[in-house]
Amino acid sequence: VAVPMVDMHTIGAGGGSIAYVDSGGMLQVGPESAGAAPGPACYNQGGKRPTVTDANLLLGRLRPDAFLGGKMPLHESAAYHAMQSVAEPLGLSVEQAAEGVVRIANEHMAHALRVMSVQRGIDPRGLTLVSFGGAGGLHVCALAEALSMQQAMVPVHAGVLSALGMLVAPRSRQLSRTHIARLMNMAHEQIEAVYAELEAKGRQELIAEGVAKAEIEIQRSLDLRYEGQSYYLNLPWNDLKSCEAAFHRLHAERYGHELDLPVELVNLRVGLVSRPTPLTLTSLPAGPASVPYDQVSLYGLEQSAAVYARDGLMAGQQLTGPALITETVSTTYLAPGWYCKVDAAGNLLLSNRV
């Protein structure tokens, strides 16, 4: 389908992903999910099969009294009973089975991260892994370690980050025109004329939605490929020769080689975006470091983990794992060997180096 899309890699490894023992006697996780209804067994809303959420609860990484700010208590007994269905066939304790479920879910997610980075020639080791979603913080340290990454971040409002982004996302239009021809057979004026037509249409639509003409930013790009290929690469529009040279470089960077073939134009694209809505978030005050409100035992760890309320953390405060950081819409598990520093905006900056 020749429409602009966000390049995403989706896997079945959410908090509702169901664990089971397959016909070969192997523990599997996902892609089947319990969803929100009936949900994980620990929701006590009719779900009977073990999920990743149940596993995190049994390992002590989820607080049964802190889920949704304590408004929705989690039932450990229901999670325990559900996890027995995979523990017994494998000859494992319930806690061992829960640990296996989390490890398999982590590996599914780590593999997806490798597909989006290593397999595309991107070395993730110098990057920061950003975690969001209600369960993202429970797995972020393990995923960063799996990719040899030393830094991660759990942004403020992580559990509802997608909804927040939707609310402040700018109005936009993406328009395209298919025109298959050898790039160097096209005239610069011919391409400019198509762009002008697309821009006029998109600008008119945004103005009709109340966007001021002066607030519209325009981005021109084109899809190019080698003649005979079935896939293409998108590049910003400049001029014919510059785009041809840039395509050769990008193809070599993405696929490891370039070809001595004519470059073919496939689509001309225009993106029109209004100025984003200013987002003002409350800054955290600096002050005395808050203290944990509890200590909990986590399966597999000799030392107890401190439990902090995220809304009580101060700017500049530093934490050492193992620790749990709870909030209404998510929980962050700071694994042993990891450190957390709270920035002025309230983001949790994680690192496995001092």
Roles of regions detected by a PLM:
Residues N44:
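Nucleotide/phosphate-binding site architecture used for ATP/NTP-dependent chemistry
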Residues G14, S23-G24, V29, A34-P38, ...:
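C-terminal, non-catalytic interaction/recognition modules in large multi-subunit enzymes and RNPs
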Residues D7:
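Short pre-catalytic strand/loop immediately N-terminal to key active-site residues, enriched for Gly-Thr
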Residues P4, R125:
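Short beta-strand or tight-loop elements
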Residues A2-V3, I11, G15, A19-D22:
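Conserved P-loop NTPase motor core
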